[in-house]
């Protein structure tokens, strides 16, 4: 027993050290930093000094309309992006898994390739495609009588959602496709023998069997959505877009830290965003756990 305990300690120690170094320490430092503010001493003529201000930075962030509106943008983004991503990725995976699909490897690679493009490059590509003077897509739309300003207040959110979908649709499709490939083929054969058609098998057999993967992807997508930063940042730089420097909470924190040098406020905004992500993650995992427990009791 002691030998097992020693072996477990030896194996787990590197993990806990790494976890502490890359997770616990940065979060702890952000919390500590959020409790302080740099102020000018000597009636503004002296140097700066770090002053303990308690929860003042949190109050300032929550009281700032721009920060609150950033959460509103995130809510709209999540409501538009998450259903499209999950539905699109699952639909493509089901299509590739069907008997009708041909050239699966080619389409897997073609759909996954956008994920290999760095986020900044992807955003720059789409900024080019959104710019009327440069984009053949916009020019073709205008020639067809379809006028849409991708940089307008109404078009900014769909523009960002489109970039994110282009980046992540293929990646999540691969996850769903792997889960579908792991389904016991005898289950599908039995459903076919019972007279189930392709649609019935897809939505009554396959989808319920990949719900665990669906829940995992949904959780990671929610967390990733809260971290929205790169795509709107690129749209904010010199495009004339309605995306402002505080469009999302992450951009608000970035602006506070590097444009206004208010690291305490930036840390407070980051901690509030992290708490939101933690609460949503807890809620999703709790709901998933309850559904599994309910099914277990029913069985």
Summary of predicted features, one role per range:
Residues 4-299:
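A structural signal for multi-pass alpha-helical bundles of membrane permease subunits
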């Amino acid at each position: 027993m002691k030998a097992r305990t020693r072996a477990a300690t030896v194996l787990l120690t590197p993990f806990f050290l790494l976890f502490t170094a890359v997770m616990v320490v940065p979060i702890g430092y952000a919390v500590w930093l959020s409790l302080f503010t740099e102020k000018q001493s000597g009636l503004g003529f002296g140097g700066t000094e770090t002053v303990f201000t308690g929860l003042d930075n949190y109050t300032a962030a929550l009281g700032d309309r721009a920060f609150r509106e950033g959460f509103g943008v995130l809510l709209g983004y999540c409501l538009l992006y998450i259903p499209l991503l999950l539905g699109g990725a699952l639909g493509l995976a089901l299509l590739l898994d069907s008997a009708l699909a041909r050239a699966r490897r080619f389409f897997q690679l073609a759909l996954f390739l956008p994920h290999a493009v760095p986020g900044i490059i992807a955003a720059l590509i789409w900024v080019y495609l959104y710019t009327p003077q440069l984009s053949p897509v916009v020019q073709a739309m205008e020639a067809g009588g379809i006028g849409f300003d991708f940089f307008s207040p109404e078009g900014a959110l769909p523009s960002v959602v489109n970039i994110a979908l282009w980046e992540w649709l293929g990646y999540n499709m691969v996850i769903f496709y792997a889960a579908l490939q792991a389904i016991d083929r005898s289950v599908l054969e039995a459903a076919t023998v019972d007279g189930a058609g392709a649609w019935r098998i897809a939505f009554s057999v396959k989808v319920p069997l990949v719900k665990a993967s669906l829940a995992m992807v949904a959780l990671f997508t929610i967390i990733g959505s809260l971290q929205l930063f790169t795509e709107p940042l690129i749209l904010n730089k010199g495009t004339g877009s309605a995306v402002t420097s505080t469009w999302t909470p992450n951009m608000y924190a970035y602006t506070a830290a590097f444009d206004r040098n208010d690291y305490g406020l930036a840390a407070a905004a980051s901690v509030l965003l992290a708490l939101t992500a933690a609460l949503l993650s807890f809620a999703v995992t709790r709901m998933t756990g309850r559904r599994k427990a309910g099914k277990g009791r029913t069985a």
